[in-house]
Amino acid sequence: MPPKARSGARRTGRRVVKKNVAQGHAYIKSTFNNTIVSITDPNGAVISWASSGHVGFKGSRKSTPFAAQMAAENAARKAMDHGMKKVDVFVKGPGSGRETAIRSLQAAGLEVSSISDVTPQPHNGCRPPKRRRV
């Protein structure tokens, strides 16, 4: 049986390494239920990320534009701590937080150099969900 850890023993977590990256990519995935913002360096290594749920919203409030705004601000703040100044934005998905997230990235102090929509388009792939009857 392995020895039991002492109560009061320190836990060694992963230390955050400060990278100095001036330019990168911001990926905004906005679904009907949530918005996820990931900011990466030009090679694709994630520097910071945030989502509506991670920021503290639960349930149907995660899909609101305000929740997307808070998530984008949070991710931008963390990226700017690593020296990020300029981003290319890639937006994916049909959600309501798309434009709000882009605006809040700009408001947080990141310079948005380009915006492109990378929403995947099916060539008649999966059957879509049935119509809602309210």
UniProtKB/Swiss-Prot annotation:
Disulfide bonds: none annotated. Pfam families: Ribosomal_S11. One of its GO terms (molecular function) is rRNA binding. This is Small ribosomal subunit protein uS11. Residues 114-134 are annotated as: Disordered. Belongs to the universal ribosomal protein uS11 family. One of its GO terms (cellular component) is ribonucleoprotein complex. Part of the 30S ribosomal subunit. Interacts with proteins S7 and S18. Binds to IF-3. PANTHER family: 40S RIBOSOMAL PROTEIN S14/30S RIBOSOMAL PROTEIN S11 (PTHR11759). InterPro entries: Ribosomal_uS11, Ribosomal_uS11_bac-type, Ribosomal_uS11_CS, Ribosomal_uS11_sf. Located on the platform of the 30S subunit, it bridges several disparate RNA helices of the 16S rRNA. Forms part of the Shine-Dalgarno cleft in the 70S ribosome. Keywords: Ribonucleoprotein, Ribosomal protein, RNA-binding, rRNA-binding. GO terms for biological process: translation.
